[in-house]
Amino acid sequence: MNDQHNSVRHSEWQTPVDSNNEPLLIHIIDDEESVRHSCNFLISSLGLPAQVWSSALTFLQQVDIYYPAVIVSDLMMPAMSGQALQAHLNQHDSPIALIALTGQGEIDDAVNMLKLGAADYLEKPINSHRLQEALARAQTLTLKRAELYSIKKLYAQLTEKEKQVAHELLEGNLNKNIAHHLDISVRTVEVHRSQVMKKMQAQHVSELIQKLVMLDS
């Protein structure tokens, strides 16, 4: 790849981390060994951890797709294409962000990948600074998706009545107004409200509102 020996400005790069303060892992998926090697070299130059895979199927068999990460994947691969991989991630509501690698004449396919939800695409040979930009975008995206996925799991624990109370709080209604709207006692509202805060892991109403807004966005 033409730019694999270009210098990378580390001073401009801040390594994103997950909720455990660990650097996000970059998964490189390509059936060509030379591409995997070159891409791994560029990503390692940024100080990021990377893991290489020769096929998307092997990746899916061995990786937890519900953990935030970034994939840099070729579009045209045997057994499972990059598009099929993106569709699989979508189907399973995975937070992982995918960057598609494209060759000449595959721009239409790359655009379709963006429509499917890919974070970005890169043309081969990969430019190191273009890769850095794409990784930054993908890392931000996977962390946002992971946060939303976590909130969805918390919200799914609420009962129907608790969801009603939660959305009344989102509207800014007081307990007595919520009681009137839902035809329940103020005391019952207080009990539901307490459960909502606990299940949604919110310390304050403002934190709860922020999480509910993310669900509605």
What are these regions (language model features)?
Residues 52-70:
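Acidic, metal-coordinating helix/loop segments flanking the phosphotransfer/catalytic sites
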Residues 194-217:
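Basic, Lys/Arg-enriched C-terminal extension of HTH/homeodomain DNA-binding domains
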